[in-house]
C-alpha cells in the first residue's frame, strides 16, 4: 500500500513537526535515508521521531531501509536508533559500520541484510527514478557481491537474489536490481514555502536529488528537514538543488547543525571561507604518517585521485607539508573535489574544496576509469592479493565506495599496518621500532569473503600496491611481491613471521626511503606523469 500524502494548500508545501511527519509512514514501507558520517546531511530530527514513535506505539512495523552512504558516528547515531526489533525487517546499505546497531541486527540474523557497492546503490536509485528495473555494471565482478560468491548477502536469513550475472558481447556484467523507496528522509539548509531547497550550509549534496526523484516518481512521500524557511521564489535558482514539486513534507529544525555537535555551521567546511596557506596542519611522525608519506610517493603531477577513510586519509596533509598539494587533485566519493581531506567520522567534510559534485555523478566518473590513482585502507589481505574490508571478526562494516573505486582506478594503493590489535611502533634515529607487536595478523592465507579481487585487477591491467609501516608489496601474476622493508625491522621476525603466507621476495628488495623516517619535511618533489 502506497503512503497517503498530505495535501498542499495554495501550492504551499505542508510544514509539520517531525512527530506529525512520521505518522505518514505505513507498515511495510521502504524508507530511503540520506546522510553521511558525522551528521553530514542527516535528517536527525526525523530519524529520532521515527525511533521514538516505535518505542511508544510499536508502529510502523517491518520497514525496509535503504541507506546509500554510511551515516552515523560508529555508535548510537545515524540509523542506529532505528535498530529496534519489529521496526526494521530488511536493509540494503552501501556502508554499515557507521551505524553499528543496525549492523548488529544483521549479524544476529534478525533482519534481512544486503550490501551493494555505494556507487552502484546510488545509481540503482537513479534507475528507480526513471522506472528502470536496475543497472548493468562490471563493478563488483569477482567480489562478494558477485552472485557466484555471496551475491551481496550479509547473513544466513538473506535468501532472495538481488544481483544476477549477465553477459553481453561475450563480456560478463552484474545486474543490480533497483528497489523503489516509498519514503525519503532528506535534508537541506533552506527552503521556500513551496519546497524549493538550497544547501548553502551543508558539506556536500550527496544523492539528495536522486533519492527525492526516486521516491516522488514511485508515488512515495519525500520528507525534508531544513534549518529555516523563506518566502516563495526568493532563493537564487542556481542555488536550488531540490525543486519544490518533489517535496511533500517539510520539517523545520532551527537547531539543525552542519555536523554532530559544535557550531551550527563551520564556514570553512561549507566552502564559504578558505584556509590560508600559512595555517599549520600537520601529522605527528608515527606509523600513520609513515604510511601516508610512502603512499604519496605513488602520486604523479596532474593526477586525479581518490582518498578513502582510515589510515589512507593522511595523504592530503602530508602533501600540504611537502608543498605539492596543488600539483594533483584528490577527490572523495561523496562529491568533494580538491582541498584538504578531513579525517574521522565526518570524512568528506573538507576545507578548501575546489568543487562539489553530486555523489551519483562522482561515481559515474570513477566507474568509467577516470581515476589515475586511489588510496584505500585495508583490513585483511590474502596471498592472491585479494582485500577484505566489508566483514571481518564477525562484524559487518560494508563496502562503502571501496568496490566502486578499486574496480577501475589505474593505480590502486592499499594502506594499512602489517598487524592489528594493540600494535605500537616508534620512529627514532631514522628507523622503525616495533615496541609492541599487534595481536592479529592482517595478511592471511585465504579471505573468506572478497571486497577487492586481485585476479580481476590483474586481468584489467591495474597497478596494485600494498603499503604498510614496515613493508611494501606489489601484486603480480604469482601473488604478492615484497619490494621494500623499513630500516630497523628484521625481514624474518618482523615481516615474514607476521604473515600467514610467504610472499615472493623481490631480487631488488630495498629499504624504504630514509626520508620517510625523519621528523622534518622530506623535500619530496612530485614526479611527472608517465606518458
Curated annotation (Swiss-Prot):
Reactions the enzyme catalyzes: an acyl-CoA + acetate = a carboxylate + acetyl-CoA
Entry keyword set: Transferase
Superkingdom of the source species: Bacteria
Active site: 333
Molecular functions per Gene Ontology: acetate CoA-transferase activity
SUPFAM superfamilies: NagB/RpiA/CoA transferase-like (SSF100950)
One Pfam family this sequence matches: CoA_trans
The protein's Enzyme Commission number: 2.8.3.8
Transferase is among the record's keywords: yes
Entries under InterPro entries matching the protein: 3-oxoacid_CoA-transferase, CoA_trans_fam_I, NagB/RpiA_transferase-like
Family classification: Belongs to the 3-oxoacid CoA-transferase family.
Additional remark text: Formation of the covalent enzyme-CoA thioester intermediate proceeds via an unstable anhydride species formed between the carboxylate group of the catalytic glutamate of the enzyme and the carbonyl carbon of the thioester linkage of the substrate.
Family annotation (PANTHER family): ACETATE COA-TRANSFERASE YDIF
Assembly with partners or alone: Homotetramer; dimer of dimers.
Chain's role: CoA transferase having broad substrate specificity for short-chain acyl-CoA thioesters with the activity decreasing when the length of the carboxylic acid chain exceeds four carbons. May play a role in short-chain fatty acid metabolism in E.coli.
Name listed for the protein in its UniProt record: Acetate CoA-transferase YdiF
Organism of this sequence: Escherichia coli (strain K12)
Phylogenetic lineage: Bacteria, Pseudomonadati, Pseudomonadota, Gammaproteobacteria, Enterobacterales
Gene encoding the protein: ydiF
